[in-house]
Swiss-Prot record:
Membership in a protein family: Belongs to the transferase hexapeptide repeat family.
Lineage: Bacteria, Bacillati, Bacillota, Bacilli, Lactobacillales
Keyword terms of this UniProt record: Acyltransferase, Cytoplasm, Lactose biosynthesis, Repeat, Transferase
Residues that bind acetyl-CoA: N87, A144, A162, T167, K168, R185
The EC number(s) this enzyme carries: 2.3.1.18
Gene Ontology biological process terms from the UniProt entry: lactose biosynthetic process
UniProt site (Transition state stabilizer): N87
Gene: lacA
CDD domains documented for this protein: LbH_MAT_GAT
Protein species of origin: Lactococcus lactis subsp. lactis (strain IL1403) (Streptococcus lactis)
The name this protein goes by in its record: Galactoside O-acetyltransferase
GO molecular function ontology, one term from the record: galactoside O-acetyltransferase activity
Domain of life: Bacteria
Locations listed in the record: Cytoplasm
Length: 207
């Protein structure tokens, strides 16, 4: 019987057992860096960024993650663009790749999940899982408490309302919310002129 090499199946959407020793060693090393990041003072932004560059697969400039921050593999499979802001308790179940575009905003308590399990109880009791990559495109805003499930893609510029459960792809340039998350409307011209139920945007005169 051939030996199952679980570490080769992590990024392929195939079933595997995560107790593979090679995977466990990689995870331990990543979690040590994550622990250091969460213990770093807010007065040490340079040290925080230095740690994030070691932790993440990719991370651009001007990114900020408010501790505490959680990730299964400490960010090892996370690809961040530039100018990303994440409020506290961002949770990335990064068993496979999570791609986040430039200028994405995460509210507090957002969860991005790539790992899932088969329905079969026999397989689940043995710990079997498989992973599906998640894509958050540029300029997306995820409100507080949003949960994004494995395999989802959220299109650029879209807004996901607080508390939403995103189970399917969301297109570009829409406002969507709910459980399950559904598109409510498109982003339109008035959104560039007003905010909060019709208040005029007046920031241009200060820029």
């Amino acid at each position: 019987m051939p030996k199952l090499e679980s570490y080769k199946r992590v990024h392929t959407e195939e079933l595997y057992f995560p107790n593979d020793q090679k995977l466990w060693k990689e995870q331990q090393e990543a979690l040590v860096l994550l622990e250091k990041f969460n213990q770093t003072s807010v007065t040490q932004p340079e040290q925080q960024m230095e740690l994030l560059k070691k932790m993440f697969s990719e991370i651009g400039e001007n990114c900020f993650i408010q501790p505490p921050f959680y990730a299964n593999f400490g960010g090892k499979n996370v690809h961040f663009g530039t100018g990303i802001y994440a409020n506290f308790n961002l949770t990335l179940v990064d068993d496979t790749d999570i791609f986040v575009g430039n200028h994405v905003m995460f509210g507090p308590n957002v969860t991005i999940d790539t790992a899932t399990h088969p329905v079969s109880p026999d397989l689940r009791k043995r710990g079997a899982q498989y992973n599906k990559k998640v894509y958050i495109e540029e300029n997306v805003w995820l409100g507080a408490g949003v949960i994004v499930l494995p395999g989802v893609r959220i299109g650029k510029n879209s807004v996901i309302g607080a508390g939403s459960l995103v189970t399917k792809d969301i297109p570009d340039n829409v406002v969507a919310f709910g459980t399950p998350c559904m598109v409510k409307r498109k982003i339109n011209d008035s959104d560039f002129k007003t905010y909060d139920h019709g208040k005029k945007i007046d920031l241009d005169e200060f820029i």
